[in-house]
């Protein structure tokens, strides 16, 4: 989302909102960046939080951004999860993070995603590595480390690069 810097981000947000698509996990200021998406379906309240890494699979946020995207390691994430847990039936984390082209998640990411569960998340869905990294059940909750490539415009035709995993979630209060 930040490949074209702040102007690209700003333009993307404005265009999505112009056609009625709600954005979350990125923004033009810190309030927008850490604003979750709240959805109600069949009387069930779902809180969605989107986070991203600094880059290159490193579990480190080495900058303090006033705009951009919600940082996966920000201390705000744990507090946001706990806050949503008090007002939502389900809390789902969408994470764009991890080391690209590795079939197993780094131990640091496994630990962080488990922390999200410890803080109250009900489901963690990872993306970014471009390959499937599998799933794990932790404290009765599911963590998907990377769903692979649903679509990626690339000349790479290896099976790992062109394979993705879809998930269907059933939510209940």
Q: Which residues does each predicted region cover?
A:
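Acidic, metal/ion-coordinating pockets
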Residues: 1-173
């Amino acid at each position: 989302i930040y490949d074209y810097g702040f102007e690209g981000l700003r333009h993307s947000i404005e265009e999505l909102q112009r056609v009625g698509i709600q954005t979350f996990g990125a923004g033009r200021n810190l309030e927008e960046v850490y604003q979750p998406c709240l959805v109600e379906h069949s009387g069930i309240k779902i809180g969605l939080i989107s986070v991203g890494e600094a880059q290159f699979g490193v579990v480190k946020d080495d900058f303090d951004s006033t705009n951009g995207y919600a940082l996966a390691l920000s201390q705000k994430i744990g507090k946001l999860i706990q806050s949503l847990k008090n007002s939502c039936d389900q809390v789902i984390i969408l994470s764009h993070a991890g080391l690209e082209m590795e079939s197993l998640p780094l131990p640091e990411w496994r630990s962080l995603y488990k922390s999200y569960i410890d803080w109250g998340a009900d489901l963690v869905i990872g993306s970014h590595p471009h390959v499937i990294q599998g799933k794990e059940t932790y404290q009765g909750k599911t963590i998907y480390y990377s769903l692979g490539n649903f679509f990626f415009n690339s000349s790479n035709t290896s099976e790992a690069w062109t394979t993705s995993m879809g998930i269907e979630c059933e939510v209940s209060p």
